Design a protein with these regions (language model features):
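Conserved Rossmann-like nucleotide-binding pocket used by diverse enzymes
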Residues: 2, 7, 27, 52-54
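A short beta-strand-turn-helix
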Residues: 3-21, 62
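Residue-level signature of catalytic and energy-coupling elements of molecular machines
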Residues: 11, 24, 41, 57, ...
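Short pre-active-site segment immediately N-terminal to redox-active cysteine/selenocysteine motifs
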Residues: 19, 26-30, 72
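Conserved helix-turn-beta segment immediately C-terminal to the redox Cys motif
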Residues: 19-21, 38-56, 62
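Conserved redox-active cysteine motifs that mediate thiol-disulfide chemistry
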Residues: 26-43
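Structural micro-motif
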Residues: 62, 68-77, 95
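Non-catalytic, surface beta->alpha helical segment in thiol-disulfide oxidoreductase systems
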Residues: 77-101
């Protein structure tokens, strides 16, 4: 499954109402560690059909970033049934991201 670009308009439908767990990657284009995590998140999205993967650009979607209390990036959040079940700040290897799920 491909990565979904999450914004305030599709957040409710794609994340809150999802019947699958959702891995969210809060990032910014200028963030070096975010650029390290991005291809890993893309890879997970392609490999795992049992989850949704979304990316949220904090510069464009600052309301969503604030709602999640994201002040450092990259921040990875796992949501199930519309609730946060796991969260990690900073770059992580693939194994650690998969373990969050």
């Amino acid at each position: 499954m491909s990565v979904i670009k999450i914004n305030k308009f599709n957040f409710q439908n794609e994340v809150k109402n999802s019947d699958k767990p959702v891995l969210l990657d809060f990032y910014a284009d200028w963030c070096g560690p975010c650029r390290m995590v991005s291809p890993i998140v893309d890879e997970i999205a392609e490999e795992r059909n049992d989850i949704k993967v979304g990316k949220i650009n904090v510069d464009q979607e600052n309301e969503l970033a604030e709602a999640f209390g994201v002040y450092s990036i990259p921040t990875l959040v796992v949501m199930k049934d519309g609730k946060i079940v796991n969260q990690a700040i900073g770059a992580r290897p693939k194994e650690q991201i998969l373990a969050m799920l």
